[in-house]
């Protein structure tokens, strides 16, 4: 048994944090989890949070700048998008140690909107990205308030892997020109690959720039698994010092970050033109989906580690407020970070004070020493983004999915190809469409079975799996393994009639084993009424067994309960069979009777 730090905010042994406890929170405590944490803050946590915040700062600065450039805005705005959102999330976010900020998973989505609309104007790019953050934040807050925190759970794991792998490829491709030291007109991922290859073959590469970028990438990847050595900090600092000492900007035309403006981000409304509204709204909604999908997964992982409960709806609100803060303080869309959060955890973070310390440290850098990173090569920043994109790519679990459920693997591949070929935003739209189709397909063609009595086995079982199971003369027991709704109502109707038609004896009763049926909608209720008419015309009585009370309540509202009659509903399959045998004399001896 492991020994946990006594100062760590964990519940007592034998207890599990759950939404039932979270529901007890009312008033300001519910909407401002940061205040709740502050009221219960322990002095013993302070040292851990301060140290973790300072360690985190070494990641926040280079990564924030790198992801800003990857998103199509000047690097300084990556630091702006780090400071205020961290402070906002500390107040509104429910997770104790989750770190928010610019992220590589959003870079491709932001760039897809900013690049074609900005026309190369950096201020216009900042306004577009800022308004995307406002849209994303508004969507997240509204979704959280109406309790739609479950919505990303509708995206299956293979589909999430698919579009994230696609986004990783798009991000990686977009950074290659910076590594090679030239620029191209982006026309989509596939065309960009061709343009990059052509430029390299034509000798447009700056090989000094390439060596700096490649060297930075190698150092980051080599130190990635080392918790004691901050790989990104070492690689970026090394590249910056080398570029400054050797004066690579002047001698080898290596592109560098340049001077950063001194001071803190100011409140500013990101004004855009009317022609930008539609693409910005679409892009903002795509950002909201991707960022919350990432944040909800990461939040649950760390909540499980700290044995705390995180309300997904409040998580959505916290993420939304952080994005609003980013949008109105010269930032751009942000998300949780799967690279910075582990750094905070490993450094001993206890609460969101870690993020507050990190934000204040970044702010101090901008006020006191903004020129510290002026010699940072842009190829090194590209290497940081590429390393993060490589980390987004999921291969191991896809291999497992390929072994156990091949068709879901191919859905994932389709999503990856869709993002890589169509671009980030259309690709995400494709992933959503595929998720809806997958959901409907599973419910549209569920498993169904005719049940029989197997020798020596209690209950009634699928005659396909128990070929020796006997059928009761005149009685069809039909099981439907799914909710009944508009997409599968007609299929249910057809399969029931097929079961009746293939019965070896004339059918008198048809009993639906309804325990797996968790819901019924209006379309399927109307279908059941039509089915009852069809069966009744043939002298067959429709009965239902083991139906759950909430589903039965729906049938009462739809008028089906009165139509079929209370006597048509049975609590168990055994009760239905016994009632049939009592009213219909048939040649039937149960194996349990023979045992007696």
Label each PLM-derived region with a short phrase.
Residues 1-32, 444-596:
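Cytosolic C-terminal regulatory domains/tails of membrane transporters and channels
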Residues 2-458, 464, 472, 497, ...:
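Transmembrane helical cores of multi-pass ion-transport proteins
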């Amino acid at each position: 048994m492991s020994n946990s730090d006594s100062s760590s905010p964990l519940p007592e042994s034998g207890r599990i944090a759950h939404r039932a406890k979270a529901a007890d929170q009312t008033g300001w405590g519910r909407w401002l989890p940061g205040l709740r944490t502050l009221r219960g803050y322990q002095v013993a946590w302070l040292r851990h949070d301060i140290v973790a915040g300072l360690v985190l700062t070494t990641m926040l600065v280079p990564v924030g700048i790198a992801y800003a450039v990857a998103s199509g805005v000047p690097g300084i705005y990556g630091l702006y998008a780090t400071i205020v959102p961290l402070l906002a999330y500390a107040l509104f976010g429910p997770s104790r140690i989750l770190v928010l900020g610019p992220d590589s998973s959003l870079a491709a989505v932001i760039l897809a909107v900013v690049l074609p609309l900005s026309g190369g104007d950096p201020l216009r790019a900042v306004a577009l990205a800022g308004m995307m953050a406002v849209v994303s934040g508004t969507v997240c807050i509204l979704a959280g308030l109406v309790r739609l925190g479950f919505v990303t759970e509708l995206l299956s794991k293979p589909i999430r892997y698919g579009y994230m792998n696609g986004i990783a490829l798009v991000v990686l491709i977009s950074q290659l020109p910076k590594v090679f030291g030239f620029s191209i007109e982006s026309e989509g991922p596939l065309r960009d690959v061709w343009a990059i290859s052509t430029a390299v073959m034509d000798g447009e590469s700056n090989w000094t720039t390439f060596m700096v970028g490649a060297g930075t990438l190698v150092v980051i990847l080599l130190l990635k698994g080392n918790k004691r050595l901050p790989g990104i900090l070492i690689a970026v600092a090394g590249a910056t010092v080398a570029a400054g000492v050797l004066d690579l900007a002047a001698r080898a035309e290596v592109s560098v970050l340049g001077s950063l403006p001194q001071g803190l981000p100011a409140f500013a409304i990101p004004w855009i033109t009317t022609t930008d509204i539609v693409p910005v709204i679409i892009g903002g909604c795509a950002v909201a989906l991707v960022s919350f999908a990432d944040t909800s997964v990461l939040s649950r992982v760390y909540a499980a580690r700290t044995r705390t409960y995180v309300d997904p709806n409040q998580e959505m609100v916290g993420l939304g407020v952080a994005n609003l803060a980013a949008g109105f303080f010269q930032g751009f869309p942000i998300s949780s970070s799967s690279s910075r959060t582990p750094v905070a955890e490993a450094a001993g973070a206890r609460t969101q004070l870690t993020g507050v310390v990190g934000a204040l440290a970044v702010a101090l850098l901008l006020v006191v020493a903004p020129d510290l990173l002026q010699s940072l090569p842009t190829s090194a920043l590209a290497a940081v983004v590429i390393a993060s994109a490589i980390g987004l790519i999921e291969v191991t679990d896809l291999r497992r999915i390929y072994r156990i459920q091949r068709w879901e693997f191919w859905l994932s591949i389709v999503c990856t190809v869709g993002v890589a070929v169509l671009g980030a935003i259309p690709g995400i739209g494709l992933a959503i469409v595929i998720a809806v189709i997958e959901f409907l397909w599973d419910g549209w063609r569920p498993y169904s079975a005719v049940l029989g009595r197997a020798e020596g086995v209690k209950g009634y079982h699928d005659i396909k799996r128990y070929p020796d199971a006997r059928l009761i003369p005149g009685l069809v027991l039909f099981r439907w393994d799914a909710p009944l709704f508009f997409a599968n109502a007609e299929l249910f109707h057809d399969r029931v009639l097929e079961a009746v038609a293939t019965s070896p004896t004339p059918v008198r009763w048809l009993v639906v084993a309804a325990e797996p049926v968790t819901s019924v909608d209006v379309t399927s209720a109307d279908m059941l009424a039509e089915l009852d008419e069809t069966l009744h015309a043939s002298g067959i009585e429709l009965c239902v067994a083991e139906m759950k009370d909430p589903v039965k309540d729906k049938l009462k509202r739809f008028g089906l309960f009165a139509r079929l009659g209370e006597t048509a509903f049975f609590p168990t399959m055994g009760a239905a069979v016994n009632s049939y045998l009592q009213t219909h004399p048939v040649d039937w001896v149960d194996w349990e009777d023979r045992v007696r």
